Design a protein with these regions (language model features):
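Conserved hydrophobic helix-helix packing surfaces used for dimerization/oligomerization
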Residues: 5-7, 168
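Cofactor-binding loop segments of dinucleotide-utilizing enzymes, especially the Rossmann-like FAD-
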Residues: 10-11, 36, 229, 236
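Phosphate-binding site of ATP-dependent enzymes
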Residues: 24, 157, 162-260
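General beta-strand structural signal in soluble alpha/beta enzymes
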Residues: 33-34, 118-120, 147-151, 170, ...
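Short, basic, helix/turn surface patches
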Residues: 56-69, 149-150, 169-183
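Short acidic/polar capping segments at secondary-structure boundaries
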Residues: 82, 123-126, 150-156, 174-176, ...
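Rossmann-like NAD(P)H-binding beta-loop-alpha module
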Residues: 141, 146-165
Length: 261
């Protein structure tokens, strides 16, 4: 039997969420849609813990509806955004403190809900977004990986550029999402070819770790999602377009049609 108590943790602008919710409605399932960015306005979250042997209780309030989260069968964690605050009276320091408190609370709450079926657990998603760990897992399962150097040392970057004869790409070490201070604007750091003139930007390189990789010529891309034991994969002919040749996420769908494999 399909799970009946489903919580979807997302953001209001996510079109994938809306499509899945509509499909669940057709199945006779009424999921609970939760946008964490609304905390502090008409959403609240409370955790009840005590010395008694009874299990912890997590109560989510959306508008005036109270939802016992321990009764959830399944949770879909789909790109929620950070909490935003309607009050303009908070200082920058106070806002940062409040966001850190929410982050600590949410991370703890999700771990406490380990009895649910997750797609996917936030702690696993965070690890999966880290390039060094991605490469380690790829190597462990037998995949070939390109030569990689992650550093904030400008000299190391220059040496790696020479080692790869100038065939180097640069990418984010983490997820690559960049949010504006008010959370209204979202940008994404894509993969780019490293130019020799970029290596003179010592101050910029020192600010944060950068992932440098040897560029490997490719015929096409494979995008795969695994749900349970099922692998859903598509082939993307990214090399058919100059727009998507370095990073397929510079979409040119008209000239690079996707096919299932």
């Amino acid at each position: 039997m399909a799970p009946r108590n489903i919580l979807i943790v997302s953001n209001p602008q996510d079109e994938h969420t809306h499509a899945v919710v509509a499909h669940l409605h057709k199945m006779g399932v009424e999921p609970i849609l939760f946008h964490p960015e609304r905390m502090g306005s008409d959403h609240t979250l409370s955790l009840f813990q005590s010395a008694d042997p009874e299990p912890d209780r997590l109560i989510l309030t959306i508008h005036d509806r109270k939802v016992p989260l321990q009764e959830m069968d399944a949770i879909w964690y789909r790109r929620p955004r950070l909490v935003t605050f309607e009050s303009n009276s908070l200082s920058t320091e106070a806002l940062e403190f409040a966001r850190d408190e929410w982050k600590a609370f949410f991370e703890s709450a999700w771990v406490l809900m380990d009895g649910c079926f997750w797609v996917s657990r936030p702690d696993r998603l965070r690890l999966a977004a880290r390039k060094p760990l991605q490469l380690q897992v790829a190597r462990q399962v037998g995949l070939s990986i390109p030569r990689t150097r992650i550093t904030n040392d400008p000299q190391e970057a220059r040496e790696f550029y020479d080692l790869c004869n100038g065939r180097v790409i640069v990418k984010a070490t983490g997820s690559g999402w960049v949010y504006s201070a008010d959370q209204e604007q979202v940008h994404f750091v894509l993969t780019n070819r490293l130019r020799q003139e970029d290596l003179g930007a010592d101050e910029e390189i020192r600010i944060a770790p950068v992932t440098f990789q040897e560029e490997v010529p490719k015929r096409f891309e494979v995008r795969a999602n695994i749900v349970g034991q099922q692998v859903l994969a598509i082939q993307i002919p990214s090399q058919q377009s100059a727009i998507s040749s370095v990073d397929w996420r510079r979409y040119d769908v008209e000239n690079t049609p996707y096919t299932a494999i």
